[in-house]
Amino acid sequence: MEGNRPDWASLIDASATAWEWRDNRLYHKEAISEPYHQPSVGRLRRMLLDHVYAAHNASRAVRGALDRLLRELRTDEWAANIGAGVKRLHSRVINVDLHDSEVIDVVTRGQKLPFASNSLALAISQEVLEHLPKPFETIREVHRVLKPGGRFYCQVPFVIGYHHGPHDYWRFTREGIEQLFNPDHWTVQQIGISVGHGTGFYRIAVEFFAVTASAVHRSLYIPTKAAFSILLLPLKFADLLTPFAAERDRSPGGNFCIAVKRT
């Protein structure tokens, strides 16, 4: 580290004037003047969300794909996790997010990234594109910052209900994912199921009971959702059958894609 600058500071585009260093973190100037306030969530509710209801990132398929990509990241290469949340995947992964926290390196606004063109070997996006109003622009920006041959791991939902973060715009089928990647610029290496049809059914069933309860009183939505998140948890075990199902692409909870930058 040079002064208060991290080792990856050399990757930043010198012409990126909308960004400002504060100690060892990089902030978009709009993120400084208009800080993003994440809704407060109790510890118990957060544990239920992360480890029971919305545990997409912990699935065997997701862990296997990401572990392989991170193992192949060389010691002189860098990656970026766009929409990193509260977890650091690897020591050479730069965490990018809307809001600041101890593990975030770049606090951004909009869909622009501060990195120089052709500077990253890997980009990661887990359950993020559905929250962006213009996902095609994000894909183009990721393409810009990746080196030729660089890879993009993109994980998106399909059969799950609305969830603000702070907004929710899109759901993606296998064909929808293919449309995100212009074949003139990308080679789609793999499209897989991140969580299967058991999770898809589970998420919709939990919402069914929670939304129905809210017809009695709005305050019943959250406790009903919490209760049925636990009661219906065995439905997720049907995901074990998804890889063997001939029609597995019809109702998975989500999909992932690994795409390689061509030019």
What are these regions (language model features)?
Residues 94, 110, 122, 143-144, ...:
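Residues in and immediately flanking transmembrane alpha helices
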Residues 120, 134-137:
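Residue-level recognition of oxygen-bearing side chains
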Residues 89-90, 133, 162:
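Glycine/Thr-rich phosphate-binding loops of Rossmann-like dinucleotide-binding domains
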Residues 2-118, 122-126, 250-256, 260-263:
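Conserved N-terminal segment of class I S-adenosyl-L-methionine
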Residues 136-137, 141, 147, 151-262:
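S-adenosyl-L-methionine-dependent methyltransferase catalytic module, highlighting the catalytic core
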Residues 114-116, 133, 173:
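GHKL-family ATP-binding catalytic core of two-component histidine kinases
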